[in-house]
């Protein structure tokens, strides 16, 4: 998992941080929040009784850090374009990008409402 997190810090964090800064995203959804969510995801994976594949672990961590990249309250993008652009530039395959998009959409309270 350490290599996955290292890649995310090198390839995803800088453009995501720039995106948030360029759009004056507040502290409630800035890079610190994204990193906190990813860290929570990491510990959930480590504590889970499930044993996830490397690919699923990577995808869950990517989805957790990128979950606000296209939040409609923050951006006017369509079809998760910010997320896709960041991941494409970082060198992720189209297949992985689409899996991460699916994960983000499944957990999005903006798209699915707060069901609790």
Functional labels for PLM-detected ranges:
Residues 21-23, 67:
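Glycine- and acidic
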Residues 12, 16, 41-44, 83, ...:
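Hydrophobic alpha-helical packing residues
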Residues 1-20:
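Short alpha-helical hairpin
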Residues 56-116:
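Divalent metal-dependent catalytic cores for phosphoryl transfer on phosphate-bearing substrates
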Residues 25-59, 72, 85-90:
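Alpha-helical phosphate/pyrophosphate-handling elements in metalloenzyme active cores
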